[in-house]
Curated annotation (Swiss-Prot):
Family matches, as InterPro entries: Ribosomal_bL28/bL31-like_sf, Ribosomal_bL31, Ribosomal_bL31_A, Ribosomal_bL31_sf
Organism the protein comes from: Synechococcus sp. (strain CC9311)
The name this protein goes by in its record: Large ribosomal subunit protein bL31
UniProt-listed SUPFAM superfamilies: L28p-like
Residue ranges of the region described as Disordered: 67-88
Keyword Ribonucleoprotein: yes
Name of the gene encoding the protein in the UniProt record: rpmE
Keywords on record: Ribonucleoprotein, Ribosomal protein, RNA-binding, rRNA-binding
Biological process terms in GO annotation: translation
GO CC term (a single one): ribonucleoprotein complex
Amino acid sequence: MPKPDIHPTWYPDAKVICNGEVVMTTGSTQPEINVDVWSGNHPFFTGTQKILDTEGRVDRFMRKYGMGSVDNATSEKKSATDETSKES
């Protein structure tokens, strides 16, 4: 037999909330569960693609340490190889 009064309170109709809107109910130990993404707005399930506003780690590293962006570094390498090929 399980010990009495040691288990958390069970809420059989806990509300799952996404962007201020109740999207579903489920059983949980919390009365409300706030989520950022669920199957109704996830790009995989909706078939849409969102463009995120985050920059890549390499770009951030290059900018942080004063090396310019990745595009600048590759274009500098190309121009250097073009100049050496023109000299010969």
